[in-house]
């Protein structure tokens, strides 16, 4: 059972103590503020509409993550320090009473956030200096805009990570929607290229330089552009249960846009 929520004096971390599972799914998120999230959608949607849409994505992503808890996977959120309190409040209905945490990243940007994920969750689990590779904690960082991803893909990614140093879920645009590791590798996300069409290739190049074995999850897509939005709307029209809150928002958006 998790202990009572603790808030640090610096407000950098709000934590419900982890139970020690060997698998953690960490959602990379931001507080939903106009102009701060999914900005590439603003030519087609107002900043306020984008923010409302992002809230739906985040809610459904948390629900997807929570569905893995029955299999012993812990759920956490990594975010900028200024967003911790707001995300903890918004995620309260999803995380209340569960073994989960909302943790502030160290530094700015996605690369710093990903580095923080593995530094925080791998180091927190290092209770035995002689822990074997097979029993090291498997940590996967997952974006907050692919709530329609089949749960089986996440389950398979954890299995793939058991046999490799790193697991990557490629996107169709050259990036990646998830990345996992069993240890902290500070240079794995160093340099530029995050959020670009060369992001995955740069990651693989750094993994090779570190002599890390890499396994792959299924290729998928996240929601960055108007085309992605239309594709998602079409898929959820046929299967709204995959991301119900997002599906409802898209249905209303389509009815007012046409």
State where each predicted segment sits.
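Short phosphate-binding loop-to-helix
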Residues: 88-137
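Short beta-strand/loop segment that forms part of the nucleotide-sugar
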Residues: 71-81
């Amino acid at each position: 059972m998790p202990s009572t929520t603790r808030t640090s004096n610096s407000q950098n971390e709000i934590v419900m103590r982890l139970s020690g599972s060997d698998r953690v799914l960490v959602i990379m998120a931001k507080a939903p503020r106009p102009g701060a999230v999914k900005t590439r959608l603003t030519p087609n949607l107002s900043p306020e509409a984008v923010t409302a849409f992002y809230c739906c994505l985040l809610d459904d992503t948390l629900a997807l993550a929570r569905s893995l808890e029955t299999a012993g996977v812990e759920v956490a959120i990594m975010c900028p320090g200024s967003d911790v309190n707001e995300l903890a409040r918004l995620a309260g209905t999803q995380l209340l009473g569960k073994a989960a945490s909302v943790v502030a990243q160290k530094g700015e940007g996605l690369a710093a956030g990903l580095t923080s994920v593995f530094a925080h969750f791998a180091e927190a689990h290092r209770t035995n200096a002689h822990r074997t590779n097979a029993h090291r904690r498997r940590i996967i960082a997952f974006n907050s805009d692919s709530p329609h991803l089949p749960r089986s893909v996440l389950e398979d990614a954890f299995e793939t990570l058991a046999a490799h140093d790193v697991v990557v879920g490629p996107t169709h645009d050259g990036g990646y929607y998830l990345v996992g590791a069993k240890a902290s590798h500070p240079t794995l996300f160093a340099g530029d290229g995050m959020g670009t069409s060369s992001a995955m290739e740069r990651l693989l190049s750094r993994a090779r330089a570190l002599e890390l074995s890499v396994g792959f999850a299924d290729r998928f897509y996240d929601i960055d552009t108007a085309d992605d939005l239309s594709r998602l709307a079409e898929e959820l029209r046929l299967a709204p249960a995959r991301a119900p809150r997002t599906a409802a928002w898209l249905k209303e958006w389509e009815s007012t846009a046409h």
